[in-house]
Swiss-Prot record:
Subunit record text: Monomer.
Active site residues of this protein: D315
Encoding gene per record: aroA
Annotated positions binding phosphoenolpyruvate: K23, G95, R123, Q171, R346, R388
UniProt similarity note: Belongs to the EPSP synthase family.
Protein name: 3-phosphoshikimate 1-carboxyvinyltransferase
Organism of origin: Streptococcus pyogenes serotype M5 (strain Manfredo)
Length: 430
């Protein structure tokens, strides 16, 4: 088996980095642009494989989408402009694509079959199947957990619902809201904990109306959306890898440019500051929720991460676990059972990967207990088809002084950060 040899024993990281566009916002710009009326233009779109799956799905649904002058141009014809696809919609590795597009297609008068790759086919879709069924959609997957492939027959006469989310999931909330835009009457979604709110913000940006009152979101449908010009900020989930690298590799100083800092996504910044990180915000634009972040090597101490903080840093927990292996004392991550149904069981995979390199991590049902600081050593590792595990391992390898680190299935990183290794080499040489 051919494995990629990762860079080890890195000196200080120096330089400036512009991380790729935010994945969550890129998906939603394409989805809302496809059903808005008029020409939507998107600058700074992430061209990772997940977002390309969303774009291809809408092309198969009859939407004209093309690239012009470094922008994505979407010719939306409104909700009525979608047409029945001639083929199965393949969502690749993207849970966001499958769940949000299922919600959107709930109100369409045709049937579709949605499939995914091996990893996506192991991710439960019961969380969207149940609320969409309540709205009058015929939708089903495999077994009780409703694993893909999904078969969906839309309904032009969707029923509004009031739905309390059993789990904290922005994807489930978004699927219901996208369906609610096509339902006649008042739909309410009640969250357990506040999750990322890009869907609510962007529905309003596209001229839609909804009311957010704490954990309750109210939307009266049906509504039409109007095309917009969207600029996608850098993805804080991608910036997180460089943030952590800068904090744990002695002598490092990095400037992360144009990072999106929507408050529902900035949990990692609060955590690292509590742990003692030296970070400075430059050129902060509060209205656009964008800033540059200067990070320097810091001595860190362990912390507790739990409760309402978890949905605000759920995707950053693998790299936070690595950070904790280099902090003084114990870091405890709780209430994060959602990690077990991501692209992989991230609790188990993070624990196994970092422990194989010498870390001291105990997996729990809903998180991890991490003792630090520990020296990391060479090991044979894999992404297990999970982009965030791959990038976490590549950053961990930089700390290794003894032995080699080999990584299997590194192509998974293309999902969200196609230029990751190129950027890594540049920061090691600047």
């Amino acid at each position: 088996m051919k494995r990629m040899k990762l860079r080890t024993n890195a000196g200080p990281l120096q330089g400036t980095i512009q991380v790729p566009g935010d994945k969550s916002i890129s998906h939603r710009a394409v989805i809302l642009g496809a059903v808005a009326k008029g020409e939507t233009r998107v600058k700074g779109l992430l061209k990772g494989e997940d977002v390309l799956s969303t774009i291809q799905a809408f092309r198969n649904l009859g939407v004209r989408i093309e690239e012009k002058d470094d922008q994505l141009v979407i010719e939306g014809q409104g909700f009525q402009g979608l047409t029945a696809p001639c083929q199965t919609l393949n969502m690749g590795n993207s849970g966001t694509s499958m769940r949000l597009i299922a919600g959107l297609l709930a109100g369409q008068p045709f049937s579709v079959k949605m499939i995914g790759d091996e990893s996506l086919s192991k991710r439960p879709m019961d969380r969207i199947v149940y609320p969409l069924k309540q709205m009058g959609v015929e939708i089903s997957g495999e077994t009780d957990r409703q694993f893909p492939p999904l078969q969906l027959q839309g309904n032009r006469n969707l029923q509004p619902i009031t739905y309390t989310l059993p789990i904290s999931s922005a994807q489930v909330k978004s699927a219901i809201l996208l369906a609610a835009l096509q339902a006649k009457g008042t739909t309410q979604v009640v969250e357990k904990e506040i999750t990322r709110n890009h869907t609510e913000e962007m529905i309003q940006q596209f001229g839609g109306r909804l009311i957010v009152d704490g954990k309750r979101i109210t939307l009266v449908g049906p509504q039409q959306l109007t095309a917009q010009e969207i600029t996608v900020p850098g993805d804080i989930s991608s910036a997180a890898f460089w943030l952590v690298a800068g904090l744990i590799i002695p002598g490092s100083e990095l400037l992360l440019k144009n990072v999106g800092v929507n408050p529902t996504r900035t949990g990692i910044l609060e955590v690292v500051e509590k742990m003692g990180a030296q970070i400075v915000y430059e050129d902060m634009n509060k209205k656009e929720q964008v800033t540059s972040i200067r990070v320097v090597y810091s001595h860190l101490k362990g912390t507790i991460i739990s409760g309402g903080l978890i949905p605000r840093l759920i995707d950053e927990l693998p790299i936070i676990a690595l950070l904790a292996t280099q902090a003084q004392g114990t870091t405890c991550i709780k209430d994060a059972q959602e990690l077990r149904v991501k692209e992989t069981d991230r609790i188990q995979v993070v624990t196994d990967t970092l422990n194989s390199m010498g870390a001291n991590i105990k997996a729990t049902a809903d998180g991890m207990i991490i003792k630090g600081p520990t020296v990391l050593y060479g090991a044979n590792t894999s992404t297990y088809g999970d982009h965030r595990i791959g990038m976490m391992t590549a950053i961990a390898a930089l700390l290794v002084k003894q032995g080699q680190v080999h990584l299997d299935k590194e192509e998974a990183i293309m999902t969200s950060y196609p230029t990751f290794f190129k950027d890594l080499e540049r920061l090691c040489h600047d």
